[in-house]
Amino acid sequence: MVRYSLDPENPTKSCKSRGSNLRVHFKNTRETAQAIKGMHIRKATKYLKDVTLKKQCVPFRRYNGGVGRCAQAKQWGWTQGRWPKKSAEFLLHMLKNAESNAELKGLDVDSLVIEHIQVNKAPKMRRRTYRAHGRINPYMSSPCHIEMILTEKEQIVPKPEEEVAQKKKISQKKLKKQKLMARE
């Protein structure tokens, strides 16, 4: 059994999914994961499908050097964004895996929320490229590990209103003013 970096608050109402050494760019996947964090599973699935179709963008907040601006990033309150298709597809597969794990556990799939999602760097894979004058440069790939925990969102029940309204405390100054007004 692999250790997750976070234990769910209520393990009976949670499901997990993880992938190791995935051949997808770490930086793009990290930005995509941050975008879907806290979303409902249906909303996240629709969003990731829209990213692959370039209908919605992923805001690039940390790894944004040289990332161009796009109008779709405005809805996130940001200027820079991209459409990392491969990262979105990998995260879609992981959401599908988590959904099937939830069904196996007997959880309500429609009320699942992405409580925790984390992308870590995996060991780099090394290749080489040949340059002018007989030199050789590295040609590395940056794979990643992804883990996510989905939790059933509990229905928030409002507190019942108290039948007896508590008396408001009135300062001495206001009391004197009220008595003065009553005399007149």
UniProtKB/Swiss-Prot annotation:
It is found in: Cytoplasm. Residues 160-184 are annotated as: Disordered. Its main location: cytoplasm. PROSITE patterns: RIBOSOMAL_L22. GO terms for molecular function: large ribosomal subunit rRNA binding; structural constituent of ribosome. The keyword Hydrolase does not apply. Keywords: Cytoplasm, Ribonucleoprotein, Ribosomal protein. Residues 167-184 have a biased composition (Basic residues). GO terms for cellular component: A band; cytoplasm; cytosol; cytosolic large ribosomal subunit; postsynapse; presynapse; ribosome; synapse. One of its GO terms (biological process) is positive regulation of G1/S transition of mitotic cell cycle. Pfam families: Ribosomal_L22. Component of the large ribosomal subunit. NCBIfam families: PRK04223.1, uL22_arch_euk. Component of the large ribosomal subunit. The ribosome is a large ribonucleoprotein complex responsible for the synthesis of proteins in the cell. Belongs to the universal ribosomal protein uL22 family. This is Large ribosomal subunit protein uL22. It comes from Mus musculus (Mouse). The lineage of its organism: Eukaryota, Metazoa, Chordata, Craniata, Vertebrata. The gene is Rpl17.
